[in-house]
Amino acid sequence: MKPSAIVYTSNTGFTKRYAEMFGEKTGLCVYSMEEAKTRLEKGTEIIYFGWLMAGSVAGYKKAAKLYDIKAVCGTSLAPTGTLVEAMRKSCGLSEDFPVFNVQAGMDRAKLNGGYGFGIKMLIKIMSKKKNRTAEDNAMLELLIKGGDYVCEENLTGIFDWYNRI
């Protein structure tokens, strides 16, 4: 049976945009984690979208206690598809569980809490790194200048999975 809703946790809006984009194309209702608490019954089958923070998917553990998660889509600064195994490990998910990672973006002006400070520290560390790779340079540029990579093409993997179930 297909999931009946999408639940997301977003910090700067990129994850929300991906969840809404996926919902629009699939016809699934989309709820923030807060909205879902009052709109969905415990145990509802969902797809969970969350942003990656220090290697883990924000809000995943809380969502897993409330809902029957059928797939996880994490948004990050890294290129689409590159962090799937790290996400799987941090969430404690089996090899056959559907996990997806999509590149989102960076808007430092919208960062909440101490995350802005963390990004500043990461920029300092990466700037001092010797022998940076092309990937390191691209990430550093994204951290400094910001950027928006949200696009439907990045959701191809999760669309393919959804259409198969």
List the model feature ranges, each with a label.
Residues 1-66, 160-165:
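N-terminal beta1-alpha1-beta2 submodule of the flavodoxin-like/Rossmannoid cofactor-binding fold
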Residues 52-165:
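FMN-binding flavodoxin-like domain, especially the glycine-rich phosphate-binding loop
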